[in-house]
Amino acid sequence: VLPLVYKILRSNTEIKQAVGEAIYRHGIAPLDAPRPYITWFLVSGRPEQQLSGTPCADFDLVQIDVWSEDDAEVERLARLVRDTCEAEGLAVRIAVNGYEPETKLFRLGLEVDFIRSR
């Protein structure tokens, strides 16, 4: 089962106002995507191991990237993403922070740990 990234991010009205429907899976946005936008992808997923029986939970590592033409806006949106995920009890850390010369967009990427009971 895929993590509930879209649902969690859309629960924050400020994120919703900033990006609208522009939250894209697989880490890829359309070339004509409105800016700013958010992409996300599953880095890895594994069951939580235990000594006996089937796993009781799944651990998914997801990267969520915020993209914008404005550096300050990227930081503001990344803070909103971080705060929204942390409010759901998810661990968040910065994975990448930079500028993409090909797209002329700033990018701030967050790694988020989704641990879900089965």
Q: What is the role of each PLM region?
A:
Residues 1-54, 72, 76-77:
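Small/polar-rich, solvent-exposed N-terminal microdomains that initiate assembly or binding
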Residues 48-50, 63-67, 88-91, 118:
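Glycine-rich loops and low-complexity Gly/Arg-rich segments
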Residues 14, 45, 69, 86, ...:
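Residue-level marker of positions within ordered structural domains that often coincide
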Residues 79-118:
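Acidic-leaning, charged glycine-interspersed low-complexity segments
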Residues 66, 74, 80-81:
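Conserved short hydrophobic patches within well-ordered secondary structure
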Residues 56-69, 106-116:
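Oligomerization/assembly interface segments of phage tail-like spikes and tubes
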Residues 42-45, 57-61, 83-87, 112-113:
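Short, low-complexity, polar/charged sequence segments that are solvent-exposed and flexible
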Residues 32-34, 54-58, 102-106:
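A generic structural micro-feature
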